[in-house]
């Protein structure tokens, strides 16, 4: 009662891993112990600012922004409204390439524009160097942080369930894109493969014709990435998705993920295609701490894979396209 003379404050959080988070890269809400009230805190300069800004750039929004009925403090609602002012910076298809592709500015430039807008009149250039210091990248650039450290730090912050994926061709100066998993349906994967990566490949071919140094290496790496992404699009085993609680006729055919099945199961083909860089990372810049080992507990006899797995909750299973297509046809013919 002494700490909360006005009663418990309404919910608030500056932690982007919480549903209650207001969504603003640098906004803060603090509890004033002298007055016993919530108030607007100072603009944040911590290790989460760049992570939130990248997520916003990729079009991600937090539950508190989308649910007007969520119980939230007025101070948090203030930042939800300020977050809405940043929506024009969000990429429409949830694909942001690190180099400039198709006339879009490179990711680092777009991210900087969003940061400047987030801090508003408080922005000074030393804020960027302080933010980079917070993410263990002192004296370096936003572009190299995106290429080298963003994804590893993103996986760590969000408990190894990344929702922004860093897809690359294995070259430090090659093709790389950040992709919003929540928007990565079949159509968007095709857009990544044939529109963005396709444009990059065309440019490398032109550079090769002009005998520009490094073009052959970049072209080979980009075409290698394109082939791997096509394997995921097609989804023949072992580049398939397997969902333990779905019967054979409801298993995804090719890249047609049900986002409700979660990152852990849907990310598998991106990690199982032949690796372009780090061991077992597939086409991702680093491998998240994700496994498909057997889950705890036993399945009920009515579970679709109970008999095959003898009640064990097996996730590391693969199915051919032929098996799945036949099962769908049989179910449709019933």
Give the label of every model feature segment:
Residues 4-6:
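Beta-strand-rich extracellular modules
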Residues 9-334:
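Terminal accessory regions of large proteins
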């Amino acid at each position: 009662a002494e700490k909360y003379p006005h009663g418990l404050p309404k919910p608030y959080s500056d932690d982007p891993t919480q549903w209650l988070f207001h969504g603003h890269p640098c906004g803060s809400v603090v509890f004033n112990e002298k007055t016993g009230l919530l108030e607007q805190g100072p603009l944040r300069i911590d290790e989460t600012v760049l992570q939130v800004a990248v997520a916003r750039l990729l079009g991600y929004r937090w539950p508190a922004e989308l649910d007007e009925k969520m119980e939230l403090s007025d101070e948090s609602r203030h930042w939800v409204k300020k977050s809405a002012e940043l929506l024009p910076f969000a990429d429409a298809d949830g694909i942001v390439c690190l180099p400039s592709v198709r006339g879009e500015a490179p990711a680092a430039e777009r991210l900087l524009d969003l940061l400047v807008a987030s801090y508003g009149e408080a922005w000074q250039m030393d804020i960027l160097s302080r933010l980079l210091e917070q993410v263990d990248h002192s004296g370096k650039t936003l572009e190299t942080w995106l290429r080298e450290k963003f994804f590893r730090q993103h996986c760590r912050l969000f408990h190894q369930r990344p929702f922004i994926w860093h897809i690359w061709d294995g070259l430090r100066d090659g093709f790389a894109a950040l992709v919003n998993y929540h928007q990565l349906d079949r159509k968007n994967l095709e857009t990544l493969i044939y529109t963005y990566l396709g444009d990059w490949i065309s440019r490398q071919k032109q550079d090769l014709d002009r005998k520009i140094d490094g073009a052959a290496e970049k072209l080979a790496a980009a075409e290698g990435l394109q082939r791997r992404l096509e394997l995921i699009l097609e989804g023949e085993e072992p580049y398939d998705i397997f969902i333990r609680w779905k019967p054979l006729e409801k298993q995804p055919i090719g890249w047609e993920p049900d986002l409700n099945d979660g990152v852990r199961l849907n990310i598998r083909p991106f990690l199982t295609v032949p690796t372009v860089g780090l061991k077992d990372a597939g086409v991702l810049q680093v491998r998240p701490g994700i496994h498909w080992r057997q889950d705890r507990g036993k399945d009920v006899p009515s579970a679709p894979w109970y008999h095959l797995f003898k009640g064990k909750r097996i996730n590391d299973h693969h199915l051919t396209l032929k098996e799945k297509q036949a099962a769908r046809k049989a179910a449709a013919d019933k």
